[in-house]
């Protein structure tokens, strides 16, 4: 559903924030070898596993980075560099939007794959503050996991430099 709802040009850049075991980032790299996919995770052990997996699968289009989202989004080589950022169960939508939208360049999309109780409306204030606008919310069903949602936010303006904040500051709101 992700590649159906987010049309990415040839050679597009993607970052999977809080990738965990590499889903959906590794799958995107397999399905679209033209994409340049960055897998970002805060646990070095996971990054090591993903590097080995990408090497065994011959995925030259995968780069693995060990960093927390709020730190990685401050790095010039990652900030506002991606056509698409994606994430799954990292945090609630307002927090996840603050973590992910700073990675997306203007005109790009943040695509959140969330559970059935999450809504685009929950991220609307954060999206506006961070230079984005809600462009879609679709429900879909996974055979073994039930109903899910894909929430899409288009980046329309640069994210102010103070974002993302440290996780303890974000979660206090």
Give residue spans per PLM region.
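Helix-to-beta-strand junctions that scaffold the AdoMet/dcAdoMet cofactor pocket
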Residues: 32, 104-106
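Short "lid" loop at the C-terminus of a central beta-strand within the Rossmann-like core
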Residues: 70, 92, 115-119
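Short amphipathic alpha-helical segments
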Residues: 51, 97-101, 123-125
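Conserved nucleotide-binding/hydrolysis micro-motifs of P-loop NTPases
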Residues: 44, 116-118, 142-143
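SAM/dcSAM-binding transferase cores
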Residues: 121-173
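Conserved beta-strand signature within the Rossmann-like core of class I S-adenosyl-L-methionine
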Residues: 107-117
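Conserved SAM/SAH cofactor-binding pocket of Class I
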Residues: 1-91, 97
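Conserved beta-strand segments of alpha/beta enzyme cores
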Residues: 36, 61-63, 109, 133-136
């Amino acid at each position: 559903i992700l590649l159906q709802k987010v049309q990415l040009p040839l050679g597009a850049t993607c970052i999977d924030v809080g990738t965990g075991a590499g889903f959906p980032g590794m799958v995107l790299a397999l399905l679209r070898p033209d994409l340049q996919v960055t897998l970002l995770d805060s646990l070095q052990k996971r990054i090591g596993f993903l590097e080995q997996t990408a090497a065994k699968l011959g995925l030259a289009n995968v780069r693995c980075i060990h960093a927390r989202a709020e730190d990685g989004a401050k790095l010039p080589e990652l900030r506002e560099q991606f056509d698409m950022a994606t994430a799954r169960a990292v945090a609630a939508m307002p927090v996840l939007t603050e973590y992910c939208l700073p990675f997306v360049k203007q005109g790009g999309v943040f695509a959140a794959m969330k559970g059935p109780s999450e809504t685009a409306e929950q991220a609307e204030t954060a999206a506006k503050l961070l230079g984005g606008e809600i462009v879609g919310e679709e429900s879909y069903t996974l055979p073994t996991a039930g109903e899910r949602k894909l929430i899409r936010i288009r980046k329309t303006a640069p994210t102010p430099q103070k974002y993302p904040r440290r996780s303890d500051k974000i979660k206090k709101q």
